[in-house]
Amino acid sequence: MKILEKETSIIRVGIADVKIVRTPDKIRTSGLGSCVGLVLYDLEAKTAGLVHVMLPDSSLSKTPDINVAKYADTAVEATVKMLLEAGCRKYALKAKMAGGAEMFKFKMTNDLMKVGPRNVLAIKKHLSLLNIPIVSEDTGGNSGRTIEFDPQSAELVIRTVKQGVTTI
């Protein structure tokens, strides 16, 4: 009798989107400029969530029905909730992230235009409030990124425009 192994799928996460995967599947997002790709995972459960965060703060939203994946202040908690519902343990969650670039340099000193760095700071703040450690990150700079996470190995592969591939 032959045992069938599940074929690996790569689940794609869009902009302002969040998805959860289990091994053997992997999860990927692209188009990370000032946006941040945040991966939360439980290595023992072989489960991970990836959220593609666009903006730091939902208070600027003009609609009452916000997309929680779009904003750092709502995306972190929403992803944690989804992972707990999928069987992960909060104390075992760890984080990796990439993105948060300054894609366009402005001559202004107004921090409001620095969306990438503000996204990174907002995510770090909310992870800290939930006591979730950041294991590694590749943030800042001025180049776009595509990331792919494997919940089996906890490796985050980062493809940076004109800079090649790194794994964290």
Swiss-Prot record:
InterPro entries xref list: CheD-like_sf, Chemorcpt_Glu_NH3ase_CheD, Cytotoxic_necrot_fac-like_cat
Catalysed reaction, written as an equation: L-glutaminyl-[protein] + H2O = L-glutamyl-[protein] + NH4(+)
Protein family (similarity comment): Belongs to the CheD family.
EC number(s) recorded for this UniProt protein: 3.5.1.44
Gene source species: Bacillus licheniformis (strain ATCC 14580 / DSM 13 / JCM 2505 / CCUG 7422 / NBRC 12200 / NCIMB 9375 / NCTC 10341 / NRRL NRS-1264 / Gibson 46)
Keyword Hydrolase set for record: yes
Keyword annotations: Chemotaxis, Hydrolase
Protein name (database record): Chemoreceptor glutamine deamidase CheD
Subunit structure: Forms a complex with CheC.
CDD domains: CheD (cd16352)
GO molecular function: protein-glutamine glutaminase activity
Transmembrane segments: none
Enzyme's top EC category: hydrolase
Gene Ontology terms describing biological process: chemotaxis
